[in-house]
Amino acid sequence: MDAELTNRSRDAINAATNRAVSEGHPDLTPAHLLLALLGGKDNENITDLLAAVDADQAAVRAGTERVLAKLPSVTGSTVAPPQPNRELLAVVADASQRAQDLGDDFLSTEHLLIGIAANGGAAGDVLSQQGASAKKLLEAFQKTRGGRRVTTPDPEGQYKALEKFGTDFTAAARDGKLDPVIGRDQEIRRVVQVLSRRTKNNPVLIGEPGVGKTAVVEGLAQRIVKGDVPESLKNKRLVALDLGAMVAGAKYRGEFEERLKTVLAEIKDSDGQIITFIDELHTVVGAGAGGDSAMDAGNMLKPMLARGELRMVGATTLDEYRERIEKDPALERRFQQVLVAEPSVEDTIAILRGLKGRYEAHHKVQIADSALVAAAALSDRYITSRFLPDKAIDLVDEAASRLRMEIDSSPVEIDELQRQVDRLKMEELAIGKETDAASRERLEKLRRDLADKEEELRGLTARWEKEKQSLNRVGELKEKLDELRGQAERAQRDGDFDTASKLLYGEIPALERDLEEASEAEEEAARDTMVKEEVGPDDIADVVGSWTGIPAGRLLEGETQKLLRMEEELGHRLIGQSEAVQAVSDAVRRTRAGIADPDRPTGSFLFLGPTGVGKTELAKALADFLFDDERAMVRIDMSEYGEKHTVARLVGAPPGYVGYEEGGQLTEAVRRRPYSVVLLDEVEKAHPEVFDILLQVLDDGRLTDGQGRTVDFRNTILILTSNLGSQFLSGHGPAEPQTSEEEKKRQVLEVVRASFKPEFLNRLDDLVVFSALNRQELERIAKLQIDRLAQRLAQRRLRLEVTDAALAWLAEEGNDPAYGARPLRRLVQTAIGDRLAKEILAGEVKDGDTVRVDAFGEGLIVGPATGKTL
């Protein structure tokens, strides 16, 4: 008999035996078995069977427990294992006979339950009292399994397999749980055409991630529910299969295939009433194939797909389709491709307008139409690694979520007032311990202040709570209105015109009036509100900024003034290069004002000039100005790319080469930080092929890396530096001393044009020639270097005073036109820094002292009072 039991039947008998042993019962009875059936880990088939005959499972369990409580128990170390009593043997015999009559090869848990109802004694009486007679249970069992026989050891997991491993989209559409689908009529019509074919009626939706492939299927489900489809598709069910759920928990070899086979049989038995949908269709290739087996889900689907017995809609991305589906031509030819293209910005705005109500109801906030337009436009402009409409929807969702979080958090006014109250309370506790007259007077004043602040805090809190309630009421009314409209639509569809008319002409208009009144009251109160209640374009821009680091928002007054004074700000740090500062400042202002060419980098410059005049320093100053951190730039030393084989490191190694997965040093840095200053230092030392790579960046603001991903450079400022022709500017070259500045620059540009290809130079925004530094500029640079040293000394509470004579000495001694300002930096380090370090370590200069630096004869005096000549 044991060999004929299904897996779950065997588990139930083992559990019943264990229960009898733990209770000390000498006999194994139908009551033990019934409790084991009810308490099994996978007992949903028993639960469904009892529910089908309207039996109360809790009452059955309680009644069976009472039966067990009356059984005699035996204790002791020599107690024999419990043996099946006469009633249990009769139950098993009855169950075996019924299985034979039904043509089943195995004895399932349902057979045992029916056997208990027929011959289970006291346990059978418990079932009968709840209306679960053997006859009723048998009828329900036959109806549930739908004519299928028990031919495997795990038949219980195969009943209602489609319900278990699928999601009914048409049921979700009928309940109004799906979002509206806008602007995909052509794709839905194409899917309907393919589904209406006689054979190979299997469309596969192909498109980039986030363009709305699943939404097309949801739109089809909504059309089926509305009846807006051809006769061949009317009243059909659209069920999404979950292959992951089928694979999950499949412990034994062949269990996944058994589950899939059962689902396919159920679909086939529906006689064309079920259309299946598999999202991520590429997962069927290889799913379930274990060990050396070639029988995966794809191969199991092929025969039914070819004969037209299975109408399936698939969805997958272009890359996955190419990599997985196209490699199996037999599977590919059974599907008809339907391309889902990325919608335009205008179409995305229409989609967002259709979804606006759902997001307003969910977040209980208002969303301005201008915010939807901003979401579509800004996501298209700045979030280039993803696709519309998904990225625009995410922007709106996150902006609304952020606003909702702000509404639920304390406003700044209340937060600040609460901190003041807490501080006053702590002060009150401290002063309360003092007994002198002045302290008592101070305490009285403090208590009056505290009472006033607490009163003000209570008033503000009450006002904030009232505003929140008003806001929440509007959100709740919108949610209720959405629900009633869904009910009215369902009532019309089901032909319940009485309910539909009550909703359409009674409840819905009344609710709309309430909503209008609440919205008007809220608008009136919004003129002097503490909480913002509408998502606007600035909120969308803030989210874009937090995702990408790009300041896409409207210019604030403070930032406007800062940009207008950009030359002055950069000029504080970069001395004597006004032309270069002007060119860079103009590029940044063009972008922030929104008038720059959106298809090119923010700016691309070639900085030329002798060493040490500020080419690299300007890039650092610009990064500091834009990001408040001079390290926030992508710096690549082009001398590392002098050999041909190193060029690939910029964009990443091609497939098949070591390092392919790592990506390129330039492309990865910009992909992670799309709004940045990119500094390509000493570009003349790079291999000529580097410039071929840079052509696309300079012209179109894009570069394709080694893995085929397009990296967006449109929000970067590209700065290339070079020392070419510097001999004409430094005074150490062939140029005559009386040569004018213009003539020197012309000579430099001639050298540059001879060294770089015309197509490269022609794509740059500007060639900026840096001048050699004069004596006055070196004095200002010396002052900058001294200020930086003073900042470092301030951390040790040391104050630095440098006389004008000392600055003049530094400028004179550090002046070397061939090397720019770098000798001056070294001079400050040796003449002041090194001497000061010795004096600090020797204890001559202590924390809190003022250090004076002055010129004396041929050197400097450094120290708190007087020092030695250097």
Curated annotation (Swiss-Prot):
CDD domains: AAA, RecA-like_ClpB_Hsp104-like
Regions crossing the membrane: none
UniProt keyword Nucleotide-binding present: yes
Annotated region described as C-terminal, given as residue ranges: 773-870
Keyword Transferase in annotation: no
Domain Clp R per the UniProt entry, residue ranges: 1-147
Linker: annotated segments: 343-549
Residues reported in the UniProt entry to bind ATP 2: 609-616
Residue ranges, annotated region (Repeat 1): 5-71
Main location (coarse class): cytoplasm
Record localization: Cytoplasm
Alphabetized UniProt keyword annotations: ATP-binding, Chaperone, Coiled coil, Cytoplasm, Nucleotide-binding, Repeat, Stress response
GO biological process terms on file: cellular response to heat; protein refolding
Job description of the protein: Part of a stress-induced multi-chaperone system, it is involved in the recovery of the cell from heat-induced damage, in cooperation with DnaK, DnaJ and GrpE. Acts before DnaK, in the processing of protein aggregates. Protein binding stimulates the ATPase activity; ATP hydrolysis unfolds the denatured protein aggregates, which probably helps expose new hydrophobic binding sites on the surface of ClpB-bound aggregates, contributing to the solubilization and refolding of denatured protein aggregates by DnaK.
Domain notes: The Clp repeat (R) domain probably functions as a substrate-discriminating domain, recruiting aggregated proteins to the ClpB hexamer and/or stabilizing bound proteins. The NBD2 domain is responsible for oligomerization, whereas the NBD1 domain stabilizes the hexamer probably in an ATP-dependent manner. The movement of the coiled-coil domain is essential for ClpB ability to rescue proteins from an aggregated state, probably by pulling apart large aggregated proteins, which are bound between the coiled-coils motifs of adjacent ClpB subunits in the functional hexamer.
Family: Belongs to the ClpA/ClpB family.
NCBIfam families named in the record: chaperone_ClpB
Name the UniProt record assigns to this protein: Chaperone protein ClpB 1
